[in-house]
UniProtKB/Swiss-Prot annotation:
This is Adipose-secreted signaling protein. One of its GO terms (cellular component) is extracellular space. Keywords: Acetylation, Phosphoprotein, Secreted. It comes from the Eukaryota. Expression is adipose-specific and highly brown adipose tissue-enriched. It holds the Pfam family DUF4517. The modification N-acetylalanine is found at A2. GO terms for biological process: adaptive thermogenesis; glucose homeostasis; positive regulation of protein kinase A signaling. Disruption phenotype: Adipose-specific Adissp knockout mice are defective in WAT browning, and are susceptible to high fat diet-induced obesity and hyperglycemia. InterPro entries: ADISSP. The modification Phosphothreonine is found at T147.
Length: 174
């Protein structure tokens, strides 16, 4: 009987916050120092004719316009184009020579979840033998994990239609 009475009384305990902490939710958000990381697309030269472009987190079934700058490459002239062998999910939109190198604008389609790499080959207009390989790497989240903060140079330009098998319009056989 004593055990039954002991469980019926609610126990109340207080929580104390250390000095300087605000009790109203300031600890529920993650804050990063501005100096820890830049919020821009990162371009890294892997070899003489190969670059890795990291575009951060993207959402599945969305299309993105990605703009980045390649440093000056002696193998390329101002007449750059994409080679005929290209990716289904990465399309070159424009190449503009700048004082820092080349401003590249492309469209990327986030077609599946995970860390994805898509490649494109850039070549000079008259010479197919001199190519530069550009690999775009993205971390694609599924649709249930929220909306990612896009890096500078990445812009969402559209969403692909989702197919959900539970919402089929097919009525079946008669």
């Amino acid at each position: 009987m004593a055990a039954a009475n002991r469980g019926s009384k609610p126990r109340v305990r207080s929580i104390r916050f250390a000095a300087g902490h605000d009790a109203e939710g300031s600890q529920s958000h993650v804050h990063f120092d501005e100096k820890l990381h830049d919020s821009v697309v990162m371009v890294t030269q892997e070899s003489d004719n190969s670059f890795l472009v990291k575009v951060g987190f993207l959402k599945i079934l969305h299309r993105y316009e990605i703009t980045f700058t390649l440093p000056p490459v002696r193998r390329l002239s101002k007449d750059i184009r994409e080679t005929p062998v290209h990716s289904l999910h990465l399309k070159l939109l424009s190449v503009t020579p700048t004082s820092e190198g080349y401003s590249i604008k492309c469209e990327y389609s986030a077609h599946k979840e995970g860390v994805l790499k898509e490649e494109m080959l850039l070549a000079c207009e008259g010479d197919i033998g001199t190519c530069v390989r550009v690999t775009v790497q993205a971390r694609v989240m599924d649709r249930h994990h929220g909306t990612p903060m896009l890096l500078d140079g990445v812009k969402c330009v559209g969403a692909e239609l989702e197919y959900d098998s539970e919402q089929s319009d097919w009525l079946g056989f008669d």
